[in-house]
């Protein structure tokens, strides 16, 4: 299987998000990379499902709460930007203050 660098990045984010979800299920608080991965994966999959950029910008800030992350993680992540493939092309989705 020959994957492009972009496809490899998407696969890595998806795998990291799967690990993060399992940790959440066990009650483990997420670290920085896990929080980024789970929100990024939510955006990529939402775009694939046909949601709009505006919907994902709003919903992306509701994926995780401060209580689900280690202390200080919410303050470390000011914005998350993800290039996602929508039915009408690739667009940049920015989520401001993604962990509230």
Swiss-Prot record:
GO terms for cellular component: cytoplasm. Keywords: Cytoplasm, Hydrolase. It holds the Pfam family Urease_gamma. The keyword Zinc-finger does not apply. It is found in: Cytoplasm. It is an enzyme of class 3 (hydrolase). The keyword Membrane does not apply. Its main location: cytoplasm. GO terms for biological process: urea catabolic process. Belongs to the urease gamma subunit family. Heterotrimer of UreA (gamma), UreB (beta) and UreC (alpha) subunits. Three heterotrimers associate to form the active enzyme. HAMAP family: Urease_gamma. This is Urease subunit gamma. The gene is ureA.
